[in-house]
Amino acid sequence: MAIRSYRILTPDTRNRSVSGFDGRVQLDPQKKLTSGQHHCGSRNGRGIITARHRGGGHKRLYRQIDFRRDKEHISGKIVTIEYDPNRSAYICKVHYKNGDKMYILHPRGVMIGDTILSGPKAPISIGNALPLTNMPLGTAIHNIEITLGKGGQLARAAGAVAELIAKEDRSATLRLPSGEVRLISENCSATIGQVGNITANNRSFGKAGAKRWLGKRSEVRGVAMNPVDHPHGGGEGRTPIGRKKPVTPWGYSALGKKSRKRNRYSDASILRRRE
C-alpha cells in the first residue's frame, strides 16, 4: 500500500498525499451493517466544550465491526476491502457459510477471495482468530481481547501489531505496539497478523481543511491567548511564558508529567510501562 501523491495544480495539492491501495473496492457500505452517529462537537448538555480541538467534519455512517470474531468453526470468505471513515485501518466484508455478513478489520496480506476461520481449532494463518493459548510464541497478533468475550480492544489501528512473547500460569505475556509489556488471560482471543494500511502515518494532509474534514479543529498556542484563557497568555508583544516550565490551560505540568492515575486495577498486569 504505497502513498499516492497529487499533481501540483493548486497550493493545497503541493504537499498532499493519501494512502493508495489497488485492491480496495469503492462501494457503498452494506446498509444493514451501518448505523447513524450523533456528533455533539465535544459539547456537553450545557454547551460547554469538554474536549478541545474537535468539531465539524463530514457526516459519517458507523460501520458495525465484528471485534468478537465469535463465529466459531464457520468459514468466511473475504468479499470486499473497503474504506472506513471512522478509523485509520481498512475493513473487510466477510460472507460466512451460514449466510451471515460481517465487517472485520483488514489484516495485512489478506486479499479478496481468501478464507478466514475463528475458534480454538483454527489454523495458524493470517486473518484467523483463536485463543492465545493455542498460538505459538512469537506470533504477531492484533485485535486483542482484554476481557474474555468482550471483543478485541488492543492493537486495532492501521499498522498495529503485538507479539506473544510468553505463556505461564494461565496468562499470556504480550508486547503491545506502545512498547508496554502486560499480562492477559490466555483464554482471550486475538487475530493473527498485522492490521493493514501500514503507511497511514506517512500521508500528508497538505492543507488545514483536510483536517477539518476529519472533525479536527486547529490548536492555538497559549502565548497567543489572553491571561484569562491560558497561564501562558498576556504580555506586551512577543513575550515568554513567564514560567520555568510549560503548563496546560489548567495549570498542570505539560512536559513529562505522568498522567496515569495511581492504583488502577490493571497495574498488577503491566510488567513494563510503555516507552
Curated annotation (Swiss-Prot):
Keywords: Chloroplast, Plastid, Ribonucleoprotein, Ribosomal protein. Residues 224-275 are annotated as: Disordered. One of its GO terms (molecular function) is transferase activity. InterPro entries: NA-bd_OB-fold, Rib_uL2_dom2, Ribosomal_uL2, Ribosomal_uL2_bac/org-type, Ribosomal_uL2_C, Ribosomal_uL2_dom3, Ribosomal_uL2_RNA-bd_dom, Translation_prot_SH3-like_sf. Transmembrane segments: none annotated. This is Large ribosomal subunit protein uL2c. It holds the Pfam family Ribosomal_L2_C. Part of the 50S ribosomal subunit. It is found in: Plastid, Chloroplast.
